[in-house]
Structures are given as C-alpha cells and as structure tokens.
UniProtKB/Swiss-Prot annotation:
InterPro entries: 3-OHacyl-CoA_DH_CS (IPR006180), 3-OHacyl-CoA_DH_NAD-bd (IPR006176), 3HC_DH_C (IPR006108), 6-PGluconate_DH-like_C_sf (IPR008927), ClpP/crotonase-like_dom_sf (IPR029045), Enoyl-CoA_hyd/isom_CS (IPR018376), Enoyl-CoA_hydra/iso (IPR001753), NAD(P)-bd_dom_sf (IPR036291). The gene is MFP. GO terms for cellular component: microtubule; peroxisome. This is Peroxisomal fatty acid beta-oxidation multifunctional protein. Its EC number is 4.2.1.17, 5.1.2.3, 5.3.3.8, 1.1.1.35. Multifunctional enzyme involved in fatty acid beta-oxidation. Also binds to RNA and microtubules. Possible role in subcellular mRNA localization and RNA-cytoskeleton interactions. It is found in: Peroxisome; Cytoplasm, Cytoskeleton.
Amino acid sequence: MAGAIRVTMEVGADGVAVVTICNPPVNALHPIIIQGLKEKYAEAMDRDDVKAIVLTGAGGKFCGGFDINVFTEVHKTGNVSLMPDVSVELVSNLMEAGKKPSVAAIQGLALGGGLELTMGCHARISTPEAQLGLPELTLGIIPGFGGTQRLPRLVGLPKAIEMMLQSKFITAKEGKEGGLVDALCSPDELIKMSRLWALEIANYRKPWIRSLARTDRLGSLSEARSVLNSARQQAKKVAANLPQHQACLDVMEEGVLCGGHAGVLKEAKVFKELVLSPTSKALVHAFFAQRLTTKVPGVTDVQLKPRKIRKVAVIGGGLMGSGIATALLVSNTSVVLKEVNPQFLQRGQKMIAANLEGLVKRGSLTKDKMNKAMSLLKGALDYSDFKDVDMVIEAVIEKIPLKQSIFSDLEKVCPPHCILATNTSTIDLNVVGEKTNSQDRIIGAHFFSPAHIMPLLEIVRTEKTSPQAILDLITVGKMIKKVPVVVGNCTGFAVNRTFFPYTQGSHLLVSIGIDVFRIDRVISSFGMPMGPFQLQDLAGYGVALAVKDIYAAAFGTRNLDSNLVDLMVQNGRQGKSNGKGYYLYEKGGKPKPDPSVQVVIDEYRRCAKTMPGGKPVTLSDQDILEMIFFPVVNEACRVMDENVVIRASDLDIASILGMGFPKFRGGLVFWADTIGAPYIHSKLSKWTEIYGDFFKPSSYLEDRAKRSLPLSAPNATQQASSRSRM
C-alpha cells in the first residue's frame, strides 16, 4: 500500500507488533485501511516472533471513524456491498477472538468506527484528553462495527445509550471513570505503556478481557428492559422522525436478550439497511454540504491569506449587538461595544454578561472563561477606541439614514484595513455604503438571533466587496464557531428571501379557514422546531411589520398582502414579549393556544374575503405542508436562478441552520428534489388558478419540471459574475 493511506506494522525486540493507521488528517477508516488492518492482524497472528499487538494511529490521533465518502458512493450506486465487513471479520474474529492480545493506544480522538476498533481490543490505554464517542446516529445510521454491543458491556446500558443516542463525546479521563478506558498516561509514555500492558496480558499477568463476552455491566434482564423502554419513550419525544434511534435500541436489546454475538449479527444487518435509508442519504448530504460552504470561487482558491482579526467594534448593544459581542468575546477577541448614551451602554453590557452566564449554566463555558471574556469587553460612547480595530460590525435599528451616517463616520475613524460590516437583514448593502468611498471594505455579516447561539452567518457581498474582506469574515465566522455561507446582495439575502413565503403561506391558509394551531402542529410534525405562528410569537411582530413594505416593493404580485399581524397588534397582542400572541405565555410554562385569538382570526378572514362562498376549505395535512413549503421552494428556485447562492447545497445549509428546516430531510432543495420538480410545479400551477400569483411557478422551476431535472443541478446559464461570486 503506497502513498499516504496505509497501515504499517513494526515488531520490536519485546515481541510486540505496533500496528499503525496512517490516513491524515484523522486516520479515517478508508477501505484500504480496513484491508490493511485485516492483513496486518492476520500476519501478526501467524508470526512466531509476535506475542502481542498494540493498535494506534499516526500523527497524534487514533482514528476519526469510517470514511464517510464511502457512504456517498453507496448512496449514488445503491450498492451496499461497497461497505467492507469490519464488524465480524476484523473486530470480532481477527481482533477480539484472536490468539494474541491487542491493546489500543489512544490519543487525540477515537470516534465512531475508531472507538469500535478499540473496544475489540483487550485493553485501552489513552491520553487523558482524547475524545471518545459514537456519533453515527448524526448520519442516520447506527454504530456498525460492534459498538452497540460492546459499549453497553463496558460502561453499562444507561451511559451507552446516552453516548449513542445523543452522539455525546466524552474525554478518556471520563472513560476511565466509567470503565471504557483501562489506564491513562502522557503522550510520551503511551506506546511504551501499551506495549507493557499487552505483554502482561499475553503472560496472563493482566486479565484477557473480551468485551463482547461481558455481562456484568448490563444489570438484570428486568433492569435492562426498563432502561431500554425508558430510552424508547424519550426517543419518541425528541427524535420522532429519526428511525436510527429506535433501530439502535432494537439492536442493543437483541444483544441483551440473545447474547453479544447475536447482537453483532443484527447490528450488521440493520446498519446496512439504514445506510440506504432516506434519512442517511439526507444527513450525509448535509454533512458534506456544510463542508462546502467555505469553498468560495475567487476567494478561497486564489492564494489569499486571512488577516488576523484581533479587535472588533460592535455598534449597538441591543439583542443582536450584544449577541454578536458575546460570540466574539467567547472566542477570545477583544470587543469595543459602542452605544449612544450611558444607559443603553450599561444595558448592552448587562445583556452580554447575562448571555455569558447563560452559557455557563448550559455547561458550554467555564466560570473562568466567562470572567476572561468579560475582561476583553470595553464600552464606548464615541469613536476614540476605533483607531486600531480590525473589523466593525454595525447592529443598529433598520433605518437607512442612520446606517449611512454611521458608515460615513467609520470610514474616517477606522484604519484603512478595517472591514466595515453591517448586520442588516433587509437593506441593500449598496444603499448602506452609498456615502462612503470604501465600498470594497463593506460587507454584510448577517447573524441570526440569538447571535451567540444560532450557528449560521450569512456573509453578504456586493459587486465591489473585496475577496480579502470576504475571506477575513469567513475566517472570523469559523473562529466564533459559525457556519459561514456567502450570498449575494438582494432583498432578504438568501435565508429571509427564500423563507418570506413561509409566513405568508401560513397566513393564506388561515384566510381560507384552516386553524392556526393545526397548521403549527402539521409543520412541527414535519420536523420544524415550531410552527410558523409560534415562531411569529417568539420573534415578535415588530420585525414582520418592519419588513412588510420592503417585501411588497421587492416581490410585487407574488407578495401576499396580509393584515393579520396588524390586527394582532391592534388587539393588544405582541407575541411572547407581552405574554399574549396566538399562544399564551406564562413565566416558566409552555406556550398554550389562546382560544380568544379566534376573534382576530375571524376579523382577518372577513377582511381577506378568500373563503369560497364564505365556507372554510377542507385540506389534508399534506396539503397544508405543501401549500406552506412549495412557495418557499419556488422562491429558492429564483434565488438559485439569480445566483444569489454559489450552489444549491449552500441553500440547504442556510435553511437548516437559519430557519430550522429539518436536517434529517437534507435541507430545503434536497428535500424538494426527493419530491421532484414536475409534482411541485403541477401543484403550484393548480393553486395559482385558485388563489393567484403568490403560487405562480418561477421560470426556473418550470424549466426543471419540463425537463425532469433536479432543482439542485447547476444552472447551465450561471456566469462567473453571479451575485454570490461578485
């Protein structure tokens, strides 16, 4: 096996064969690696000069798991035989049942199939901070190399279920406390200690433990069944649409009832079935799509190097500004928070402190790191601290004259290299920077609320934004643990523009007689975090009212003119902010549907006059789902046609991370392609005849439907000067 992907074996004078996985950067289990492991293990078992084996990984990492690229090939071909036999042939027969003991020497990480290999060894030695986990369920599958059987036997059912169903990583130090790791040592001592341990097993001075044969951590049959049943009920609540959760529990139960070997055989069968499931195809697509978002033609492929961003100024300490500042502070970036008066500044600083305390409570930040973050924050009422900032992010209210004035000032007070970013969600960037001469430095940094938690960052460029500014903001996005998606400059950018029909479609359904709370139930059941009306309550009605005229001007006849939000406000309803919207909100309680909102709904229907003959329309749940999401798909087609996004998969990630579109459906465009353009076009055409241009199919969709092409296929007319590539 030539090249970087290989398995090596070195036999020392002590009789220990050190087998090393070499596949940078994380030693993924490519089929070549798996074949190499089989060959080296077979050779070690046959050689008289080998007494024991140490399995490790090159470059300070044990193994990051199975090579996910293989799943893509399986999905393309439908040929599951491309998956090599690892569970039985390698882990069970060659490693665990082998006549010579194996010890896993772990550092860096042992994830997925990597951790499963270690559990096929007879002992595990690790550095304390190594990350251990079985994250397979995030890809729509289950551990397939024996993990569902061995992990419960090493750490007990409750911990194993937690690690697998939540895809939770633990450190090796935690693993030692729980029984997964046998001993901890420094990186310098790892191989030496592992060799000695392997020899002591071979010489019967340490126990020769085959994990699959253990039952002492499983508890009694009744206890195991109780734990599994409880886990099933929990999975139904939190993962109702995800088949891999119940499948994982089924396979674990098989092992408990019928023994480890029977469990391994069932695991292998179910694993192959799940690899070909729609859920796995969608989640694997989303995995690779997220990696692609940072590949930007003309920016990341032209030998530019990102500049160091050490100090950032945030203008505006409201909800968005304080959230953005929080995200920067947590990443150890110095922040200047500017406000217009001491009261607003103090409020912004308090919001940042509250955000940080919230992260501590959630366990994602230590108290020490919180204090360090706060020490990096400086308040300001003028621009005197802007002379050495590397980036400014403006996050004030959506008023054009105010933003123009700020950017005109920034050009005068900031250094020439400073990036001038705006968090606007609706205003044309060319308008924002109209009164400056530094248009190449102006860029959109559109965060989603709450900015320190939501993972998406829309990076908006104009035709004048420099590639360097884009690259720098991509780098900052990654630094603050956001997923950056580069988009073009248009009303609503990619996410808000694509999803503007989402709320409007729900309003149309209400106008023709469909119950508000039924709509929310249908959309939640589909996999959205909440329905459109609960989302409106949470976001507040101010945003909807603020963008109403902007969308009407930009989108013309396909914009639905609805006065439902106006009527809600007139009725004294502001959503969650005043405890009363479509739902009632009590402190600490769950939202409850408010029956009294029907008065507002009735008035809205009278104003809309869209119910045929004044009678409610009868629709199935599928009709409701399609009438809300197909217009969204239709707008996504326009976004792709205008090249607002670089590729369709960027819109998939933006829909998942920005709007909560279910990841297990692969993203908006991926989901639409599973349905097909002809069907979507036919339904939209039918509704256009009944309800008007809100549903009118775009030319892009019409073309794809006529030719039965996927919506995600690259646009043949796409030019290098597309908006997202400017």
